[in-house]
């Protein structure tokens, strides 16, 4: 059973980063940094597929094995892959420090082999009042992504 994972984020533009995942008890601690962002919040999600053959678009929708509507990371109604937002400072750097109790590095909610994506816009956490909000959080285009792999 994997206890650690890593993801290298890359895109067509300046956005890049490295994200680390570590299983701790019933949670996964997600840490790292992303550079090249515009200042402010950016949606941060695990997507269904580990397929980046056509850039980030081939990663599919948010990882959602429970067939729920999109929500925030603390909501009961959320996709497993909904990790909310990361916030970039005025220098375009987002420091990631998330503890989540729904994603896993093993079993049916495992994120290993799936794609981590950072988005162009803030995630409205499913509260945007339209259909797209309940699917994507209106987070916009995919700036950078990478497949989550087992780490030592």
Swiss-Prot record:
GO biological process: action potential initiation; anterograde axonal transport; apoptotic process; auditory receptor cell stereocilium organization; determination of adult lifespan; ectopic germ cell programmed cell death; embryo implantation; gene expression
Keywords of this entry: Acetylation, Antioxidant, Copper, Cytoplasm, Disulfide bond, Lipoprotein, Metal-binding, Nucleus, Oxidoreductase, Palmitate, Phosphoprotein, Zinc
Modification N-acetylalanine, positions: 2
Subcellular location as annotated: Cytoplasm; Nucleus
Modified residues annotated as Phosphoserine in this record: 101, 104, 106
N6-acetyllysine: residues carrying this PTM: 121, 135
Entry EC number(s): 1.15.1.1
Reactions it catalyzes: 2 superoxide + 2 H(+) = H2O2 + O2
Residues noted as binding Cu cation in the record, renumbered to the chain: 45, 47, 62, 119
GO molecular function: copper ion binding; protein homodimerization activity; protein phosphatase 2B binding; protein-folding chaperone binding; small GTPase binding; superoxide dismutase activity; zinc ion binding
Disulfide bonds: 56-145
Gene3D superfamilies registered for this protein in UniProt: Superoxide dismutase, copper/zinc binding domain (2.60.40.200)
Cofactor: Cu cation; Zn(2+)
List of residues binding Zn(2+): 62, 70, 79, 82
GO cellular-component term (any): nucleoplasm
UniProt keyword Kinase, yes or no: no
Chain's role: Destroys radicals which are normally produced within the cells and which are toxic to biological systems.
Assembly and oligomerization: Homodimer; non-disulfide-linked. Heterodimer with SOD1. The heterodimer CCS:SOD1 interacts with SLC31A1; this heterotrimer is Cu(1+)-mediated and its maintenance is regulated through SOD1 activation.
Family: Belongs to the Cu-Zn superoxide dismutase family.
Protein name from the UniProt record: Superoxide dismutase [Cu-Zn]
């Amino acid at each position: 059973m994997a206890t650690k994972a890593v993801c290298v984020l890359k895109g067509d533009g300046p956005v890049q980063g490295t994200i680390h995942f570590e299983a701790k008890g019933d949670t996964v601690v997600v840490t790292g940094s992303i550079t090249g962002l515009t200042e402010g919040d950016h949606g941060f999600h695990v997507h269904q597929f580990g397929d980046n053959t056509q850039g980030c678009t081939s990663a599919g929708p948010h990882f959602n094995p429970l067939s729920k509507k999109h929500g925030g990371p603390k909501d009961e109604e959320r996709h497993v892959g909904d990790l909310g937002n990361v916030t970039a400072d005025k220098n375009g750097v987002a420091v990631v420090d998330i503890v989540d109790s729904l994603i896993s590095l093993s079993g049916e909610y495992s994120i290993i082999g799936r794609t981590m994506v950072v988005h162009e816009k803030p995630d409205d956490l499913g509260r945007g009042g339209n259909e797209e909000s309940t699917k994507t959080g209106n987070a916009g285009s995919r700036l950078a992504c990478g497949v989550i792999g087992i780490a030592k």
